[in-house]
Amino acid sequence: MILCGVAGIQSQSITVDRQMKRYNVPRLAFVNKLDRMGANPHNGIKGICDILKLNAVAMQLPIGLEEDHAGVIDLIRMKANYFDGEHGDEVRIEEIPDNMKEDAEKYRAEMLEAVSMFDDKMMENLLEDNEIEEDTIHTAIKLSLIHI
């Protein structure tokens, strides 16, 4: 499901969600248009929870919004992905900017907690404060998607 980063949940989002529910289609949402004026990806996530009544968490955080949008932080790998080139088609991977590390840790913890509800191994690792492998996170995400 694609959501507008400015308008959030729109009438067609509700229609698409209704059809996805009807046919038991797992849902993964993308927040688009983060380079537009008034963009706020958190409104999209809040709308998914409040309007569509689904559990939603961020798996990426934008680096800048509107004309300052430069890339995203991957909360699974905990790396910053910058989109360079004339059309943003060249990906440059770097460490997370210092001014975004705290937010990245916060949203990663929310994501890990949410998807761990569907994977006992991951839940155990979280409770024991163990390092969580990327493969374990991917498995938990897959399980969370098919249990909607």
Functional labels for PLM-detected ranges:
Residues 4-146:
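P-loop NTPase catalytic nucleotide-binding module
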